[in-house]
Structure formats: C-alpha cells, structure tokens
C-alpha cells in the first residue's frame, strides 16, 4: 500500500495520529537521522502492511502490539527524540 516507511509516516501516521508535540510528547522533524527511530518506524510500517489486510483482529493487533508501544518509546522523555523539538534536531 505504501512504498516506504517514510511515505507511510508522512501519509498515514501524521494524518491519523495527530498528537500535540512538546512537553512529554517529543518528535523530531529529522526523524530519519535517528537510527532507532528509523528501525522502529520501519518495523511498524512492515507490520502495518501485513496486519491491516486482516479483516479480523489485524488492526487491533497492530495497534496494541506494534504502534502503541513503539510510538510511546519514540515520543517519550527518554526516547530517541529526547533532546529534539519539532523545530530543532539534536543528534
């Protein structure tokens, strides 16, 4: 459905999961420069591509087992974006 994790983040994640970034929830506009973020988002995208096709519990399984825990780590106070802001990348 999506050709890459980068396209999936831009066209799906940001459209569906709109979070107010700042404070406890962190994001980096240069997420591609954070190896952990790339790995986690790639894993979430690959799981999405398989599980969203499951008419049964696929979406629930994806949310609970893949998206929720990984996105919480990514955007948390001690995650890969801990020193970044939406406007400022810190390697």
Which residue ranges define each predicted feature?
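Short terminal alpha-helical segments
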Residues: 1-27
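Alpha-helix boundary/N-cap detector
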Residues: 4, 8, 32-42, 54, ...
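Alpha-helical repeat scaffolds in large eukaryotic proteins
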Residues: 10-17, 42-52, 68-75, 79
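Amphipathic alpha-helical interaction modules
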Residues: 17-51
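Amphipathic alpha-helical binding modules
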Residues: 56-91
